[in-house]
């Protein structure tokens, strides 16, 4: 086992504080409408430029191991805030820095660290309740645009694009961000259910000019099995041919004579048919086939349910207004499934999302939810260079997370004003002893830090502006972009309540642990013995000098 380096008390805390400040100072320059960029060196390719707090935090590793421990703990604050709300990482880092700095001063002055932490926790619990009282719902397109604009660093086009996307696919719809090919941002909306499986044979194509298969008012056969024997399919093919409607077959696989028969029938015009593989794998495939059958009003032909393909009838098939199949995707538009059945399926998926523990499972469940409830919107980010593209894409993703958080828990006045108002309303709070009271004051003072930093980044005097804002009431605050005072809601400067709440809670949680730290342990650096071993043979040969 490697030897350890152990530091105690003030010596440990000073080292840790140095690490906290290095990371927080690098992150906080990005805050506000006049925040600066940070350039991050990469091991290969061009450096990346960002105004995203968590991207800056993730890049920082310090040489001194004790300082690095402090930096890594604050990095955890930014990561947690990012995971919870997708934004507010810079605010969370700044709050943590302020609480740690003020808290460690109090510890050095002889206060009890545990009581300080209890005071900080008490102040935060009270502040979160006050935040909920200040929060107003964010439901209209204008408010969503404003939240998106603020989070995208005052880029109004991004805010408007996100609001348009949410309007088209609904608040539950999936909105993805991709790198575009042009200079302008674009919005592409896919209505209906789309999955990543294309036609099994190019001979199904009936629109050669675009290379796609288009079926109008088709029957849809959903089978959770491989189909290779054509005899299984003959009864259903005959029934569909008599109806005069086209047929889409979605199955685990379709091969051999079964596929050949379908191709021949399609080319001769006996029955207009197309076949695709079922999306997903394993249990996820079964769930998605069930989704498709519910959306189209059909049944999944599955041997597990004792259903045989040979005995299936037109009543077992689903229907849709239109199906479009390309080389890579299948889109089902206007499924005729019953609304209450679709709605109960949506409720079931929502319940699964709440119970899911892994991010991957949640992401896949959200995709299924969107496909059933509205559609998918793709935001394509345009830029002149790759460096700008990466920076812009990160901002758009932040803005998207912020707008989702705003719809979920509402909004409060932005620009650090909400936290100042909350601190004012919590100022009469008292703990069980003086040390707890100091902890409460530490937390309340920290709540002014975001406003002070926004003002500092815009080149004004933080204390003057903070006092002016404190003298005001309600949503009265300072607009750093235009250098004027007024109602932040009227200015369109809003923060999602969830983002502000998460930032405060995670900052206080980690900062409280750091204040109560008394000992730090790390590995001692290993001594490089190679230089000693290289020098020993030469030293042993010294006596040979007399032979010359």
Swiss-Prot record:
Gene Ontology biological process terms in this record: protein refolding
Compartment(s) where it occurs, according to its Swiss-Prot or TrEMBL record: Cytoplasm
CDD domains listed in its UniProt record: GroEL
Gene Ontology MF term list: ATP binding; ATP-dependent protein folding chaperone; isomerase activity; unfolded protein binding
Subunit structure: Forms a cylinder of 14 subunits composed of two heptameric rings stacked back-to-back. Interacts with the co-chaperonin GroES.
Family membership noted in the UniProt record: Belongs to the chaperonin (HSP60) family.
One Pfam family of this chain: Cpn60_TCP1
Biological function: Together with its co-chaperonin GroES, plays an essential role in assisting protein folding. The GroEL-GroES system forms a nano-cage that allows encapsulation of the non-native substrate proteins and provides a physical environment optimized to promote and accelerate protein folding.
Enzyme Commission code(s) on record: 5.6.1.7
Signal peptide span: none
Keywords: ATP-binding, Chaperone, Cytoplasm, Isomerase, Nucleotide-binding
Name of the protein described by the UniProt record: Chaperonin GroEL
Gene name tied to this protein: groEL
